[in-house]
């Protein structure tokens, strides 16, 4: 009887432990997105996003992103993500570096973050800290002017999926104060919805939308801006 129970446990447990967890990235990916955006500061504008995901091995991946905007705002982002497979899901450490050149205001925004995250088939959560340094292009190195520094801000991200993350199509809902190119103060969350569908062996169509209120956690949830994206991903 004991041998039978042991065989039963092994038969059920080994496939579960060896199964694809359903969310890991195993292919190099190139994503190109067109974007329409409006906010109360920059008005109507369009963006072009180019993103490259590079999973060097099962334990480490890197992502590089660039965005050009008709609002004369230019973004670069790098993400480094060590990953650790757990009995259920995946634990990861994420380091992000963002650079935003705001040509219209002649200033540059540098942001860096460190976060700890966990993801499973239907949910991904990330919590961490980030710091921001802002510099004016007219700043002189020979004066007493200093950078504007925000030393510590809370970073949070919660994304819920309707299907396992390795499914040929999916729909997700996002609550966060960080997206691909910006990190907002903790009281300025972003609400988003995203979808993708695999249309061929190497091709994926992406759609997403985001809305950002103004200072929601200060009880002022008036509309600030919205973004709509559409594009494709090529999986190598």
Describe the role of every protein-language-model region.
Residues 1-29, 236:
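Cleavable N-terminal export/targeting peptides
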Residues 19-71, 233:
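Short glycine/proline- and aromatic-enriched beta-strand/turn motifs that initiate or cap beta-hairpins
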Residues 28-30, 56-64, 86-94, 122-127, ...:
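Repeated loop/turn-to-beta-strand initiation elements of outer-membrane beta-barrel proteins
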Residues 34-40, 66-72, 84, 97-103, ...:
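Transmembrane beta-strands of outer-membrane beta-barrel pores
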Residues 34-36, 50-54, 78-84, 112-120, ...:
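Residues on the lipid-exposed face of transmembrane beta-strands in outer-membrane beta-barrel proteins
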Residues 42-48, 72-78, 106-112, 121, ...:
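Residues that define the transmembrane beta-barrel architecture of outer-membrane proteins
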Residues 64-68, 99-107, 136-149, 181-184, ...:
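Flexible, solvent-exposed loop segments that connect beta-strands
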Residues 177, 182-236:
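Predominantly the C-terminal beta-signal and adjacent terminal strand-loop region
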């Amino acid at each position: 009887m004991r041998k039978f129970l042991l065989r039963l446990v092994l038969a059920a447990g080994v496939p579960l432990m060896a199964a694809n967890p359903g969310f890991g990235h195993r292919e190099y990916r190139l994503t190109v997105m067109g974007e329409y955006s409006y906010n109360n500061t920059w008005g109507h504008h369009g963006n072009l996003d180019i993103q490259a995901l590079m999973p060097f091995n099962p334990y480490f991946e890197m992502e590089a992103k660039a965005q050009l905007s008709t609002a004369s705002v230019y973004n670069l982002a790098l993400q480094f993500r060590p990953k650790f497979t757990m009995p259920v899901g995946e634990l990861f450490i994420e380091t992000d570096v963002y650079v935003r050149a705001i040509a219209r205001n002649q200033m540059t925004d540098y942001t860096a973050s460190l976060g700890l995250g966990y993801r499973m088939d239907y949910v991904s959560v990330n919590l961490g800290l980030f710091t921001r340094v802002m510099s004016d292009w007219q700043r002189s190195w020979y004066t007493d002017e200093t950078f504007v520094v925000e030393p510590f801000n809370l970073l949070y991200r919660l994304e819920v999926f309707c299907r396992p993350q390795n499914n040929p199509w999916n729909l997700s809902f996002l609550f966060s104060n960080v997206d691909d190119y910006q990190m907002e103060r903790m009281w300025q969350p972003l609400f988003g919805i995203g979808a993708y569908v695999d249309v061929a062996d190497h091709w994926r169509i992406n759609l997403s939308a985001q809305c950002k209120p103004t200072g929601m956690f200060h009880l002022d949830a008036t509309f600030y801006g919205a973004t709509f994206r559409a594009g494709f991903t090529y999986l190598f």
